[in-house]
Amino acid sequence: MDNNNMLNEMIENPEEAIKSITVSDLGYSVLQPQYFNQFVREATRNQTILSEARRIVMDAQVVNIDRTGFSNRLMEDATEDVAPTGTNPAFAQEQLIAKEFVGMVGINDRSLRRNIEKQNFQSTLISMASEKWGEDWESLAVFGDTTKYSTGDLLKSQDGWIKKATNKLYGTGTGKDFTGTSVAIDELMKQMLQAYPKNYLKNRSNLRFYLPSELFDDYIDAVGQRPTYVGDDATGQNIARPYKGVPVREATVLNDTEGADTTKGYGKVAMLMDPNNMVYGIFQEVGIEPDRQPKLRKTDFVFSAESDQGFENPGVGVVALYNETKPSS
């Protein structure tokens, strides 16, 4: 089939056109494994936090995340004819519960016929959808909160990492942990490190400071004041050196208009996390269905995916909330 015939086929019979990238069951089409992998890879690779967090491909709507650990010492002094007292491991469990989300990409017939990708159009379609999907996905994973935002808002549909983290520092209110209106960024980062569980500070290079652009610039400026090559690199090349061994990342998702709104959202946020402790899951089937609109001379491609996010251990990490009031105890 030549290019023109192929494109005409996509316009006139879009269901046939996507057969090469999907597996159909009872009229519902899901991406083949290689295209599923492409969708997830391209959705996450440009997202600072999502690309570093640990991904689980879910084979069921509910997946348990188990962890074990010891709350007391295991090793003890040996005494002849005396049995060790023994230490039982503590078990805990978190859950990922996949929720379905949908999105639509509309392409008019003229654009489709002029498409320069020709036979690679199906892959291009996935790339178009996954890139934007990834931006929204990361915003939800970070800022999601079922008790905030307006009804119908994407960020209200699930709880994200900020909501699920148990260690929080507050910048306003009685008993606040820091003064959100005036604290220096390096002072706040020092305080966040102090609040981080000490047992999990063994390898600081595995941790991350995630900062919105404003705070990242403040950190660059603070480092840039040093009369050294480190200061020159910071201001001249926008290089953020690690803070006390912890890499510092600019996470543009923390600039999200809704999530960072001081009235409906969380406002300004800084995070100190171990990405391997931040878990997100996506159900192994991503759906795609064409919806032909002949009167409008266009075809809408409806994507659907199920996902959730959480922690292996919600107590390992620190979130600093500049504009949130510390709850009364």
Q: How would you describe each model-predicted region?
A:
Residues 31, 124, 128, 211-214:
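Generic recognition of stable, solvent-exposed alpha-helical segments in well-folded globular domains
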